[in-house]
Amino acid sequence: TLPMNGLTARRSLDLLDLSAGQIVAVTGAAGAYGGYIIQIAKADGLTVIADASEADEALIKSLGADIVVRRGEDVATRIREHFPDGVDGIADGAVLKELVIPALCDGGSFASVRGYEGDGQRDINFTKTFVREYDGETEKLDSLRQLVEDGAITLRVADIFKPEDAPAAHRRLEAGGT
């Protein structure tokens, strides 16, 4: 999970090109990618506002989010309640696309893991995150390893299965939420 999801999160944050003190919003925050975005963003000195269900709110806070808002189609409105001028960047792990763009300030940056390019509105910088672009850049993975060793990133394990329980593990993975 660290090489794939952690590097994908690192790539997204690098594409957003935010500086310490700026604000990033994270959708799909309870997922592996979203969780890494939160933790790496905090290590980078960013302010993090993240979405979550009521059941996941404590998890998202424990990962370091400064503000947690309820997820859903009107998440952009809830983000703007905290940041009326909009956030500087969005890491869209929930693939909300045009539903979350209103939370972004004019000239902000949007990172998509599914290649969403927007329509060029409000001078927004739309980026596509492809982890393969970090192929061979071992220093990126090494920096994540260091964050783990420093305690800035926690590795989450949903459950442990015995080999004979592999079918149950696959069913759980296919059901989502792991």
Tell what function each PLM region has.
Residues T1-T178:
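Terminal helix/beta-alpha structural elements that buttress the NAD(P)+-binding lobe
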